[in-house]
A protein has these predicted regions:
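Beta-sandwich/jelly-roll carbohydrate-recognition scaffolds of carbohydrate-active enzymes
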Residues: 2-166
Length: 166
């Protein structure tokens, strides 16, 4: 269970300050985005670590039989289960040939904000690689309400102190 203090109460926003790797699966559910046609869980842009990454499309499902001990009127013979499709949200970032992975190096800052008024998920991360390079990553994720099949991510990377190798 997620402690109530993890998400300060704010009008029109859900804010998470810091990152608890033990509760990623729960927070991925809290930061999910959907428009009725496409749904994406709020997992981290770089993919790892993750609880349960997910991208779901309306009308993309599998059918399965629904067995009953006794048949009866109105008992469906088949059920439908929505399928997790290929994850198109992954962004792999290398910082001087080291993968950007929050499990290694030092996490200096991490904040996620689900802006309920704008319908976007914003994330800010400041991370120091094991070799000492410091970067700041800002991302904004959205699913379009007007073009229902579009999901987009704006991903900005900034070298904080020294310029990283080009």
């Amino acid at each position: 269970m997620i402690p109530q203090t993890r998400f300060p109460v704010e009008p029109w926003a859900v804010r998470e300050v810091g990152l608890n790797l033990d509760q990623l699966a729960q927070s991925e559910s809290v930061f999910a985005l959907s428009n009725g046609h496409i749904g994406v869980r709020g997992n981290l842009d770089e993919g790892d670590p993750h609880g349960l990454p997910g991208t779901y499309l309306n009308s993309f499902y599998e059918t399965r039989p629904l067995p009953y001990a006794e048949s009866g009127y109105g008992f469906p013979e088949q059920g439908q289960t929505i399928i997790n499709v290929t994850d198109g949200k992954l962004i792999r970032l290398l910082v001087d040939d080291e993968p950007f992975d929050l499990r290694y190096g030092a996490l200096r800052e991490h904040e996620r904000i689900l802006d309920l008024r704008a319908g976007v998920l914003r994330r800010t991360v400041e991370w120091e690689s094991p070799a000492g390079q410091v970067i700041r990553v800002r991302s904004t994720r959205m699913v379009s309400l007007t073009q229902r099949s579009i999901m987009a991510i704006r991903y900005e990377v900034e070298a904080v102190h020294d310029p990283a190798r080009q």
